[in-house]
Every structure is written in C-alpha cells, then in structure tokens.
Curated annotation (Swiss-Prot):
Location of the 4Fe-4S ferredoxin-type domain: 2-31, 39-68
GO cellular component, one term: photosystem I
Positions of [4Fe-4S] cluster 2 binding: C21, C48, C51, C54
Subunit structure, as described in the record: The eukaryotic PSI reaction center is composed of at least 11 subunits.
Name of the featured protein: Photosystem I iron-sulfur center
Organism: Ceratophyllum demersum (Rigid hornwort)
Cofactor: [4Fe-4S] cluster
Cofactor binding comment, as recorded: Binds 2 [4Fe-4S] clusters. Cluster 2 is most probably the spectroscopically characterized electron acceptor FA and cluster 1 is most probably FB.
Entry annotated with the keyword 4Fe-4S: yes
Species classification: Eukaryota, Viridiplantae, Streptophyta, Embryophyta, Tracheophyta
GO molecular function: 4 iron, 4 sulfur cluster binding; electron transfer activity; metal ion binding; oxidoreductase activity
Classification via InterPro entries: 4Fe4S_Fe-S-bd, 4Fe4S_Fe_S_CS, PSI_iron-sulfur_center, PSI_PsaC
Residues the record lists as binding [4Fe-4S] cluster 1: C11, C14, C17, C58
Catalyzed reactions per annotation: reduced [plastocyanin] + hnu + oxidized [2Fe-2S]-[ferredoxin] = oxidized [plastocyanin] + reduced [2Fe-2S]-[ferredoxin]
Nucleotidyltransferase as UniProt keyword: no
Length: 81
C-alpha cells in the first residue's frame, strides 16, 4: 500500500502544495468550494514518496493537505540518500 494524500475542504487553491511536490502527485482542477475556484487533488498517490513537502508548504491554519504514511517502499527509502 502506498502513502495516502488527502485534500480537505479548507483548501484555498493557492497551488503551494502543487509546486512543492517533487514527484508531481498533486495537480489543480476546477472547484467551486473556494475563492480561487480550484483545488489540488492527488490523482497519482502511487508516486508519493512521503516527504510531506506539500504539508510544509500549505499556508492554511488547518493543513488542507495531509500525507498519511503507509509502508515504506523502495522509492520512498531512496530519499535518504
């Protein structure tokens, strides 16, 4: 099982998480739930390496993007080098 990336309704559509992701897991799509009219879903969670850069980049008080770590994969363990 890969890492799980969840985007919450508190997303403000700022694109900070999308720009911070080194593996392009996130992308912006149209969404009427915020002023920016866009949200960042995670269509490619299998590429997530669990670095949590998206969480660090999120400017909202309640992090709108959260990474829930699954078992380590060969790919995610490679970040240590």
């Amino acid at each position: 099982m890969a890492h799980s990336v969840k985007i919450y309704h508190t997303c403000i559509g700022c694109t900070q998480c999308v720009r911070a992701c080194p593996t392009d897991v996130l992308e912006m799509i149209p969404w009427d739930g915020c002023k920016a009219k866009q949200i960042a879903p995670a269509p490619r969670t299998e590429d997530c390496v669990g670095c949590k850069r998206c969480e660090s980049a999120c400017p909202t008080d309640f992090l709108s993007v959260r990474v829930y770590l699954g078992p380590e994969t060969t790919r995610s363990m490679g970040l240590a080098y």
